[in-house]
Amino acid sequence: MQLRSALMTGVARRTIFEPALTLSPEVVAWINDIAASRGPFQSRVGDKPLSVSMEGLVWQHESSAIPMFDCVWDLGGETVVLSLSRPLVEALVSTVQSGLAFPTEPTASLILELALEPLIARLEDKTNRTLHLLRVGKAITLAPYVELEIVIGPVSGKGRLFLFSPLDGLVPFAFRALAELLAQLPRQPRELSPELPVIIAGEIGTLRASAALLRKASVGDALLPDISPFGRGQIALSVGQLWTRADLEGDHLVLRGPFRPQSRPLECAHMTEIESQLRPSDADLDDIEIVLVFECGRWPISLGELRSAGDGHVFELGRPIDGLVDIVANGRCIGRGDIVRIGDDLGIRLRGRLACND
């Protein structure tokens, strides 16, 4: 019996879908924090202003039209790879000596480390570890990486901070320290797209009823609302914790004020009174809940087949189950992602930004 159970367990495990990528819960928390939209880091390199902005996390490697150079750093025994575009490397070199030809190793490492010495000193002070540039060479490191927009004086370019490996364990100290430093930058929530769909509910009345009354209710019983603006030709429109009123004109609803915060709009019996003209704040809008649905596919089916489908019916997906997952909000696809393992559970890793915050 034990042998049979072991064999059955082995078969079951082989049939369970296993994502190509496994992330530990700690790594997921770190990724979500590092990829958050924040204000730029601002400082100076020599006599030139420096600005570094986080552009997001890139999972699928993208070739660069502009030559990139891997700058391999050692922070207290841990390796960190930061790739910079050639114009950025040249801009850093010019802060040490203008007109200097593009250097080769080991000169390149020495000059870049000298150019970044004030920033290096600040990082060493905050981490209590030594930071040293090991080498600079042609970019060969592959995704995933955090994409950076870097501006040095009049020169702008891309930077790539490559993630550690593996991603199913602990976050290395160097990257934890980086997240702590970035956490000091103010968050800047991305603007919501005006095309993001939300669901508005039209409410015609409310009724306070006891559980005993509901248990006794049967077919044919009539329920009389306590509050029913519908009898006055009005309907309450609600989305999340926001509401407004509208007049019913034929098969149209005409708004009679902006949406504003109120937890239970129909508990206010005086809907015809003059309402506050204050529009909802960003915080009010942020509280609106939007259900995200993760879809592995859609396919047409006839009503006849649907009626006859019973236990054991087989639907053909027409695509591999480990393909891209559609992220749907109120019927609209706003993004795509890959299935990944997070500890004992499955999650969805975004392939790009959601359409609602482009």
Curated annotation (Swiss-Prot):
InterPro entries for this protein: FliN-like_C, FliN_T3SS_HrcQb, SpoA-like_sf, T3SS_SpaO/YscQ/SpaO
GO cellular component: bacterial-type flagellum basal body
Pfam families with a match to the protein in the record: FliMN_C
UniProt keywords, alphabetically: Plasmid, Transport
Molecular function, one GO term: cytoskeletal motor activity
SUPFAM superfamilies per UniProt: Surface presentation of antigens (SPOA)
Biological processes, Gene Ontology terms: bacterial-type flagellum-dependent swarming motility; positive chemotaxis; protein secretion by the type III secretion system
Physiological role: Could be involved in the secretion of an unknown factor.
Family classification: Belongs to the FliN/MopA/SpaO family.
UniProt-recorded name of the protein: Probable translocation protein Y4yK
Upper classification of the organism: Bacteria, Pseudomonadati, Pseudomonadota, Alphaproteobacteria, Hyphomicrobiales
